[in-house]
Amino acid sequence: MMKANHSLTVEFILIGFSDHTDLKTLLFLLFSAIYLVTIVGNLGLVALIYMEPRLHTPMYIFLGNLALMDSCCSCAITPKMLENFFSVDRRISLYECMVQFYFLCLAETADCFLLAAMAYDRYVAICNPLQYHTMMSKKLSIQMSIGTFIASNLHSLIHTGCLLRLNFCKSRRIDHFFCDILPLYKLSCTDPFINELMLYIFSMPIQVFTITTVLVSYSCILLTVFKMKSKDGRGKAFSTCASHFFSVSIFYICLLMYIGPSKNSNKDIPVGVFYTIVIPLLNPFIYSLRNKEVVNAVKKVMKTHSIFKNSSASIAH
């Protein structure tokens, strides 16, 4: 009975960044600023898309959901990491660990599906512009978003449930700044064969499907763009896809570096920082700064707020 209950009472110690105690104040301030900007940027983008009717299109529906998932990823990782900079023992309970992993897995799985959906949306817009409203309707984009959240939740629940079957008795020290699946396997005294099998059965097909969708979509886009005779048409097509292509490239490069085999565990921390903290910070700016529709929507909201503020001041006087 004691052995069966062992995994229910275990606590872990997150030792990521513990080698940089002299920089803990600087790192705390840096990551606090990143966290604040990430949450404001992503939730601000979600609010903007919700409030502006002109942004109620498939591309922005996917973008709003991506921003929501980036906020989820940041909220799952950063608060505990900030707490640990000044924590004496750096402990995290099994329950907290599973919750953190669940939301991280949910966010990253949803990101994969959403980036693939956005690539398909760009493919339809550039390669089949006359059929865009029938092939990629608002209703279909909402259905795809709902399907993404259902699939991502199921994927997260499967892996979290499999983690709970493990007994952790080798060590409590996780050589990372958050609870992730592979570092937890190293601490298990239960054979993680079933867990690893679930990775091959569920995670690998998701990666293959989403990466293939992105690659095929952009291959078709490039072929279509190179066939265009108009330079203006080419420029418009490239500018339409540039932000998404850049975002999806850094996401998958970091993902493949992070999940790839490595003998040096210290490599996982900087790649993990970029993958889970920096990318959610960059995405709202990548998609917004050169996007005229988003910039115009921001100006409209600011103008409306300014008019409302001036009207309120006039009434008060």
Curated annotation (Swiss-Prot):
Subcellular compartments: Cell membrane
GO MF terms, alphabetically ordered: G protein-coupled receptor activity; olfactory receptor activity
Annotated SUPFAM superfamilies: Family A G protein-coupled receptor-like
Keywords, ordered alphabetically: Cell membrane, Disulfide bond, G-protein coupled receptor, Glycoprotein, Membrane, Olfaction, Receptor, Sensory transduction, Transducer, Transmembrane, Transmembrane helix
Cysteine disulfide partners in this protein: C97-C189
Glycan attachment positions: N5
Gene3D superfamilies recorded: Rhodopsin 7-helix transmembrane proteins
InterPro entries: GPCR_Rhodpsn, GPCR_Rhodpsn_7TM, Olfact_rcpt, Olfactory_GPCR
Annotated Gene Ontology cellular component terms: membrane; plasma membrane
Keyword Transmembrane: yes
Pfam families listed in its UniProt record: 7tm_4
Residue stretches spanning the membrane: 29-49, 57-77, 94-114, 145-165, 199-219, 240-259, 269-289
Any Gene Ontology biological process: G protein-coupled receptor signaling pathway
Highest taxon, organism lineage: Eukaryota
Entry function: Potential odorant receptor.
Sequence similarity: Belongs to the G-protein coupled receptor 1 family.
Listed name of the protein: Olfactory receptor 5K17
Species for this entry: Mus musculus
